[in-house]
């Protein structure tokens, strides 16, 4: 599996495993991977490529946790991933079309807030 950076989009990558299987957009700051968008092409969804992508991100990148939000259409997938990787679901959202946020692996909200406040001084 490999990621290929898109030409004109910052932090966006195509996901390849011999052939293109999806698209991902993420940003890493202070060892926190902020997942913006993950799409697996429908014909590859039941072949565990979503799990493989998350495992790839955790192993290849120097990150402590993944932070993201759950779309209504992908709640089942994220529920399984949160349980599998000992994550936590948080009932706060930033976007209108999401149901909840998540942190994988589990990290105290206070610790995450401290990391984010170092990045964004306006949170204080």
Where are these regions (language model features)?
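Conserved acetyl-CoA binding element of GNAT-fold acetyltransferases
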Residues: 31-42, 69
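Short, cationic low-complexity segments
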Residues: 115-124
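Conserved active-site tyrosine of GNAT-family acetyltransferases
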Residues: 78-82
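Conserved catalytic-core motifs of GNAT/GCN5-like acyltransferases
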Residues: 69, 84-110
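Conserved GNAT acetyl-CoA-binding A-motif
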Residues: 60-72
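Conserved short alpha-helix immediately C-terminal to the canonical SAM/SAH-binding motif I
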Residues: 53, 74-77
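Acetyl-CoA-dependent GNAT
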Residues: 1-32, 36, 123
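Conserved acetyl-CoA-binding loop-helix of GNAT-fold acetyltransferases
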Residues: 40, 46-59
């Amino acid at each position: 599996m490999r990621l290929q950076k898109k030409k004109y989009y910052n932090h966006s990558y195509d996901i390849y495993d011999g052939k293109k299987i999806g698209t991902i957009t993420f940003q890493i700051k202070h060892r926190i991977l902020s997942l913006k968008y993950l799409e697996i092409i429908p014909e590859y969804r039941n072949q565990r490529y979503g799990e493989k992508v998350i495992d790839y991100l955790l192993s290849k990148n120097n990150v402590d946790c993944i932070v993201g939000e759950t779309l209504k259409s992908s709640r089942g997938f994220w529920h399984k991933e949160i349980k599998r990787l000992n994550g936590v679901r948080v009932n706060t959202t930033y976007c209108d079309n999401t149901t909840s946020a998540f942190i994988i692996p589990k990290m105290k909200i206070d610790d995450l807030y401290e990391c984010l406040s170092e990045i964004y001084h306006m949170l204080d």
